[in-house]
């Protein structure tokens, strides 16, 4: 039987002294000019490594997860995992101990046992060494995404990383090599791939509703004026107290946050599942808003703000498709991810309102009979036809997780992303996004910077799959056989029910609170009482679920 409940508090660890620093231009990137194009070279795959296209890992009946980074995005992830059956939250880690401890509240409310707490600049290092963790979920500031993920993979953990998961090509290649070497999943946590509209549009694309999709658009357009002051100020690396996100935009050029717009359209275009990005050109405006913000915060002139207020990146694929991605977090305008698909037989757009354009014959061919006679692709579908089309092509992911997802907030896409990841781990299936997706979606920062720093020159993409981008024909989500899925789900529900019963039976939270409040004289006694209760609870859970 696996260890079920960890000995919280015994691992209350703190570390210091390490400062991560990421830049969108990595010194190890090799490139050369070829007829006016910057050709970024693809490193040779190290001997003995194999690609991880369609990687499957051994089934994990109970997914033991640790969270690193509990500032803005991390607490929500902890809360969501409390509602996924068959999960054990083993550890919580943040630079600031209080933030990690605060997330215990989600576990307490859900009736789950306390997790171990880690803190400090390198608290994650000891966390990653633990043998009783299957998945490390990284939601730190951008500078720490890579070092935490690297440490987790080096210690044999599946790894899920908030976006952007890698800040430059050097980090992309190192994560690729580690995933290939360890045969562990390294997933980019791109939640916008699980937006309800994007999921259904993907279903339609795969069914040919839009014909062949030739052009796509995506973006992250979100004025962050209301948020800049809330980003963490690293005491070791932010003397001007700009906050990590503004500081990164000041110091780096290129689309530094491309994945929300790029991820969903890349799936629709089957990137590295039959097609690949080949060429990129990027342009940006001058910096106005960001520069003015820094000057207001520091009281000094800012003459070196690298990131333009608005960045536009154009990409072409091997199959002749074109993608446009935009980034603007500076200027006042409504939130917009664009998400537009232009096909040979139809068109889809999410903003400013969700809509689809098909003519009468294509709508009929797609399985929906029009209720009006003059239907034309010159206008969008009427409400009834649109609703019927969305219902017919509703994603199985939405059918399974959509209702609970909406209750969990942020439109439901975060919960569906996490639930799908756990589902795939429990069923031994390939994850929805792999390490090559991570690299392809995150590389726009460095490649775009190369383009713009060289008079907006064309830049040739490296092949992150190193020759395997055409092995799989078409993007698809993996599903277990119905009987296998049902058995795994039943076991997960039974496990979580047994955990909750025994947390209450053995008064684990009362004993945890006693341990927290104990003075030096009574600390050892309180620790012993808590540890004994944990052992008894583990034994009872094992008997109830018959885990081996």
How should each PLM-predicted stretch be described?
Residues 1-4:
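Positively charged n-region of N-terminal signal peptides that target proteins for export
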Residues 8-16:
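Bacterial N-terminal signal peptides
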Residues 18-22:
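Sec/Tat signal peptide C-region and signal peptidase I cleavage site
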Residues 24-110:
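N-terminal Rossmann-like dinucleotide-binding module
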Residues 24-39, 43-47, 53, 75-76, ...:
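C-terminal helical cap and adjacent loop that interface with cofactors, partners, or active-site loops
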Residues 116-134:
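A structured beta-alpha segment of the ubiquitous adenosine-cofactor-binding alpha/beta core
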Residues 135, 141-142, 146-194, 208:
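Beta-strand-loop-alpha-helix segment that lines the small-molecule cofactor/substrate pocket
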Residues 185-187, 192-305, 455:
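Predominantly a Rossmann-like dinucleotide-binding segment in NAD(P)-dependent oxidoreductases
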């Amino acid at each position: 039987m696996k260890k079920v409940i960890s000995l919280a508090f015994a691992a209350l660890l703190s570390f210091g002294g390490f400062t991560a620093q990421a830049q969108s231009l990595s010194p190890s990137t090799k490139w050369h000019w070829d007829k006016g194009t910057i050709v970024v070279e693809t490193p040779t795959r190290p001997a003995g490594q194999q690609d991880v296209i369609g990687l499957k890992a051994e089934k994990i009946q109970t997914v033991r997860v640790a969270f690193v980074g509990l500032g803005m995005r991390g607490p929500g992830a902890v809360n969501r995992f409390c509602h996924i059956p068959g999960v054990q939250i083993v550890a919580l880690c943040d630079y600031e101990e209080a933030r990690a401890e605060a997330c215990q509240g989600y576990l307490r409310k859900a009736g789950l046992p306390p997790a171990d707490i880690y803190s400090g600049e390198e608290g994650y290092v000891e966390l990653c060494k633990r043998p009783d963790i299957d998945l490390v979920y990284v939601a730190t500031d951008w500078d720490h995404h890579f070092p935490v993920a690297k440490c987790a993979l080096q210690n044999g953990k599946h790894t899920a990383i908030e976006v952007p998961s890698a800040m430059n090509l050097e980090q992309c290649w190192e994560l690729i090599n580690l995933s290939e070497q360890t045969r562990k999943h390294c997933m980019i946590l791109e939640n916008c791939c699980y937006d309800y509209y994007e999921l259904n549009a993907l279903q339609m694309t795969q069914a040919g509703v839009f014909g062949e999709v030739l052009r796509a658009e995506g973006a992250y357009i979100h004025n962050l004026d209301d948020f800049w002051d809330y980003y963490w100020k690293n005491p070791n690396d932010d003397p001007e107290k700009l906050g990590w996100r503004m500081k990164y935009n000041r110091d780096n050029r290129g689309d530094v946050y491309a994945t929300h717009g790029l991820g969903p359209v890349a799936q629709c275009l089957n990137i590295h599942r039959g097609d690949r990005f080949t060429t990129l050109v990027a342009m940006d405006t001058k910096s106005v808003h960001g520069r003015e913000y820094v000057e207001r915060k520091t009281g000094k002139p800012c003459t070196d703000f690298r990131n333009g207020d608005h960045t536009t990146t154009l990409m072409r694929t091997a199959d002749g498709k074109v993608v446009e991605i935009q980034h603007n977090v500076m200027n006042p305008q409504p939130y917009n991810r664009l998400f537009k698909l232009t096909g040979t037989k139809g068109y889809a757009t999410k903003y400013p309102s969700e809509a689809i354009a098909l003519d009468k014959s294509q709508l009929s061919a797609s399985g929906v009979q029009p209720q009006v006679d003059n239907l034309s692709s010159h206008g969008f579908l009427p409400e009834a036809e649109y609703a019927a089309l969305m219902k017919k092509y509703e994603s199985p992911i939405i059918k399974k997780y959509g209702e609970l997802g909406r209750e969990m907030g942020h439109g439901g896409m975060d919960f569906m992303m996490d639930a799908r990841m756990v589902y795939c781990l429990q069923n031994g299936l390939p994850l929805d996004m792999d390490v090559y997706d991570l690299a392809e979606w995150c590389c726009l920062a460095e490649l775009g910077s190369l383009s713009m720093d060289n008079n907006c020159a064309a830049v040739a993409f490296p092949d992150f799959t190193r020759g395997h981008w055409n092995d799989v024909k078409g993007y698809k989500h993996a599903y277990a056989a119905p009987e296998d899925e049902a058995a795994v789900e039943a076991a997960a529900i039974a496990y979580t029910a047994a955990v909750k019963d025994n947390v209450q039976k053995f008064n684990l939270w009362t004993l945890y609170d006693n341990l927290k409040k104990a003075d030096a004289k009574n600390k050892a006694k309180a620790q012993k009482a808590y540890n004994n209760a944990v052992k008894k609870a583990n034994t009872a859970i094992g008997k109830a679920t018959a885990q081996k």
